[in-house]
Every structure is written in structure tokens, then in C-alpha cells.
Regions:
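Alpha/beta enzyme core
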Residues: 145-155, 162-288, 293-307, 324-325
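Conserved, mostly hydrophobic/aromatic
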Residues: 21, 78, 99, 157, ...
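An N-cap/entry alpha-helix motif that binds or orients negatively charged groups
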Residues: 2-72, 178-236
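Glycine-rich active-site/cofactor-binding loop and its immediate structural neighborhood
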Residues: 73-109
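Hydrophobic faces of well-ordered beta-strands that scaffold small-molecule active sites
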Residues: 76-79, 106-108, 127-131, 155, ...
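Conserved small/polar residues in nucleotide/adenosyl-binding loops
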Residues: 326-331
């Protein structure tokens, strides 16, 4: 199987499984606990039927929309994905180029493989930054200040990851960042020689936005769950979010809102948008799917907030269903990068 033979998301997933070592593939592919929520995110779209009205003159469809104060050519954008250079050497650079090519937003993770400044210099397309609030407030402040200097268009504060989800696939494979080549994992890496070649002949893996502040994750191997539990602030509260909103002073969303009550409170602290998200089912297994929660939240907040659905999106009809339930936009974080990302978009 090659890129030219990939026609849907499942095709790309099969190709990724073929090309990536098991620890890398299962990190990006897996979810929390029994992965019920992860699978439900997509199943909820499939449980919703479309009833088309015919003869409505759609010869010149207009897919344009606006979110984070940014005009986009389509109602989808790339949700933030960590450590993309583990999946392709160009990592975040390829994602940013693909988003710019198709007139949509690129979202950068705090745990990106390339820095805020590198991506800003590479792409003139719209960009938002996904912020994790760290225990060390100087890290959080530094990230916000750098995004301001780099002229990012918006920011989203991830609020559903103050402690790590129980990702059992990662326990089994021993996934760490950077990857550790142990006796247990050696065979898996050895069976993917092209990945190994790319890993050792391209830019050294690093958490580019954090490397000057935190050694673990770049120079010292650590599990992602260990990093989250050690570095992210479990005491984060509404006051902390409001502080970041005021410091950023621009278009901003809370990412990880699932309840009507929290959506209403996001308005009160100055958010311009919310991302209805359960972190792709990677945090709390058993939570509701974003698609099933969209209408209740949108009915509650009206036009006071942009409402963005994150997670489970696999096809254009999924985007259509989300838009019909009043979202401003749809995002997904499991897309590939480079040519694969362009074909998926």
C-alpha cells in the first residue's frame, strides 16, 4: 500500500501501521483504558442519519468560514498533535504547509517537534497555539510571549489533561519521548528500517518549545504520561485560565469543554471560542462524544462563543453533520503529515 492507494482515513491508518514501529504507532493510534470513548467519537457520527433535500442548486458551494478571527476556505482545521517528527521527519512543518496550501488553520502543540519560531518563519498561513499550563509558570508565560512575538492568530488552552490518561497501549509498548531502544522494543524498530534511518539522519528529536526549560522529554527519555504528571499543573483552575486569557489578549478557546455549565463559564472569563473535546478519547474513558454534546452546548451559548468540535472526524459527511448541529468548525488530531496530510485534507 502507498499514498496513492489511500482513499479514506482507514487506508491512511493501515499505511501508518505498516510504516511505524509499534511504540510510535500505538501512541498516536491509542486511547485511554478500554478505548470505548475513542471509538464512540466516530461511531456517534455514524449513528446520525442525513435526510437530503433535493433540487437546491448547489452548483457553486461556498465552504468558507471564520474562526479565531481568521477566514478559512473550509470548515475544518488541523487540531494540535504532539511530537509529529516521530511520524514523519518534516513533522509540524509538513502540517503547517498543508494547512496553508488549503487555506485553513494549523494548530501547534506545546509538545511540537519544531519551535514556534521555526513554524512562524516557514508558513504565512493562519496558526494557533495549544497551551498546556505547567507547574512552572515561567514556562507558560514564555510560551504565550513567544506566540505573541511570532504573530500567531489564536490560542487554545487544553483543560482536560491536568493528569495523564491511562493509555494501556503505551504501558505495553514502553513508549517514551525520545524513544528508548530497549531489548523489548528492538525488534519492533528493526522491522521498520526506513523509520530508523529517518530518525537518525534527520533533525535530532526534541520537544522544541520546551527544550530550554525542561530536559526530560528531549535529553532524558520519559513516558508521556510521566511527563504530564510531573510537569502539568493538576491544581489548574478557572482563575489560571482567566490569567492566560488576559495575558494573551486575543482570540482564545478552552479545549476540552464537555459540559453546558463549563461552556457558559468560558464566556464569563473572556473566551472567544470553545473546543468541545474529550482529547480524542485519550484521557477519560467513558466520557461522552463531542458530537453528541454539540447541540446542547450550542443551544446554551448561542452566538456568544465560537463552538468547535474536536475528535472523531473521519469524512466530509462527518464535517457536514457537525455543521448542521451548529458548530463553527470541526477539527481532528489524528491526521498524518506531508503528502498524507494533504491527501487527507
Amino acid at each position: 500500500m502507498s499514498l496513492k492507494n489511500c482513499y479514506n482515513f482507514d487506508d491512511f491508518r493501515k499505511l501508518a501501521k505498516k510504516k511505524l514501529p509499534a511504540p510510535i504507532f500505538h501512541y498516536i493510534d491509542g486511547g485511554a483504558d478500554d478505548e470505548v470513548t475513542m471509538n464512540r467519537n466516530t461511531d456517534s457520527f455514524n449513528d446520525c442519519d442525513l435526510i437530503p433535500n433535493i433540487l437546491n442548486s448547489v452548483g457553486e458551494p461556498d465552504l468558507k468560514t471564520e474562526v479565531f478571527g481568521t477566514k478559512m476556505d473550509m470548515p475544518i482545521f488541523l487540531s494540535p498533535t504532539a511530537m509529529q517528527s516521530l511520524y514523519h521527519p518534516d513533522g509540524d512543518k509538513a502540517s503547517a504547509r498543508a494547512a496553508e496550501k488549503f487555506g485553513t488553520i494549523y494548530s501547534m502543540s506545546t509538545m511540537a517537534s519544531f519551535s514556534i519560531e521555526e513554524i512562524s518563519n516557514l508558513s504565512s498561513g493562519p496558526k494557533i497555539f495549544q497551551l498546556y499550563i505547567h507547574k512552572d509558570q515561567s514556562i507558560t508565560n514564555d510560551l504565550i510571549d513567544r506566540c505573541k512575538r511570532a504573530n500567531f492568530n489564536g490560542m487554545c488552552i487544553t483543560v482536560d489533561t491536568i493528569v495523564a490518561g491511562n493509555r494501556e497501549r503505551d504501558h505495553r509498548t514502553g513508549f517514551t519521548t525520545p524513544p528508548k531502544f530497549t531489548l523489548d522494543s528492538l525488534m519492533s524498530f528493526a522491522m521498520r528500517p526506513q523509520w530508523v534511518f529517518n530518525y537518525f539522519t534527520n533533525k535530532k528529536f526534541e520537544l522544541a518549545n520546551l527544550k530550554d526549560k525542561v530536559e526530560k522529554g528531549t535529553n532524558i527519555a520519559q513516558s508521556v504520561m510521566g511527563y504530564i504528571n510531573e510537569q502539568y499543573d493538576p491544581a489548574m483552575n478557572w482563575e489560571d485560565a482567566e490569567y492566560c486569557i488576559k495575558k494573551w489578549n486575543g482570540p482564545i478557546a478552552l479545549k476540552g469543554v464537555m459540559s453546558v455549565e463549563d461552556a457558559k463559564r468560558a464566556i464569563d472569563i473572556g473566551c472567544t471560542a470553545i473546543m468541545i473535546s474529550n482529547h480524542g478519547g485519550r484521557q477519560l474513558d467513558g466520557s461522552r462524544s463531542p458530537f453528541d454534546q454539540v447541540k446542547a452546548i450550542k443551544d446554551a451559548v448561542g452566538d456568544k462563543l465560537e463552538v468547535i468540535l474536536d475528535g472523531g472526524v473521519r469524512r466530509g459527511t462527518h464535517v457536514l453533520k457537525a455543521c448542521l448541529l451548529y458548530t463553527s468548525d470541526a477539527a481532528d488530531e489524528r491526521s498524518s503529515v506531508d503528502l498524507g496530510g494533504r491527501r487527507i485534507i
